[in-house]
C-alpha cells in the first residue's frame, strides 16, 4: 500500500474548513490524509498529554511518523538537557507510548544533519541509536552526500538493511555535499519512507546570509510531469516492500497539500477509515 501525507498538520490552509481553530486542524487534516509527520518532537520531547491528545483526535487507522528529538541526531547546539544520552533516548521512547499502544506509530524518523558524514564514528553511532530504539521501527535520512558516494553507496544500503533501518528516500535539490541523491532502494521488507523537500536550489543553500532561509528552503511546487515520474518511482518501491509512506514537505508556499492531493489522483487511491469531512454548505 502507498500512504500519502504531509509534514505537520497546522499550515495547510487549502484543506481546512473556513475559520478552523488551530486545535481542530489535526482532525480536519485526518479527513484528507491517513498519515502525518510529527515534527514538534524534533524540537522537544513531547509530554504525554500532547501525544495522548493527538492519538485521541485521529481515526483508528491513522499513522504518525514521529521525528527523532534533535539531541538524538546531533542537531542540538551545546549540551543536551539530560544527564546522559541513554536517559535522553529513554525519555523519548517513553513519549512514544501512546502511539505504540494505539498501533498508530508508523516509524520514528532519524534525520541527520549535513555535517553527519560517512565515517567510522558516525557508523558506530547509527548502530548505537538503533540498539537503543530496540524493536521500534526507525527510518534513516541523510543530508550528507558522502553516504551515497561511489565508494560507500552499496555499503550504506547494506548496513541499513543489516541494522534494520527503514530507508528514507529523498527528493531534494541536488547541490553539493549538503544533499543526497534519490536512491530508489528499500532496505526494509515492510516499510519505505519517501520525503519530498522540493527542488529550490537557491533556498536550499541559505541565500542572503540565511536570515529567512527557512521561509524559502521548501518553496517549491512539483509540476505534473515531476509527479508522474514519481508515480513510477513509488510503484517501483512498492515492489520492494509492503508499504510506502510518502510525505510532502514542500510547504514554504503552501504547496504540500495540493501536491499530495495530485499524487493521490495520479495513483488512483481512495483511503477508507479517514475522519468524517465537515461539509461547507455556505
UniProtKB/Swiss-Prot annotation:
Q: Which cysteines are joined by disulfide bonds?
A: none
Q: This chain belongs to which protein, by name? A: UPF0759 protein YunF
Concerning SUPFAM superfamilies, the annotation shows: TM1631-like
Q: Which domain of life is it from?
A: Bacteria
Q: Which PANTHER family match?
A: UNCHARACTERIZED PROTEIN YECE, UPF0759 PROTEIN YUNF
Q: Which family does it belong to?
A: Belongs to the UPF0759 family.
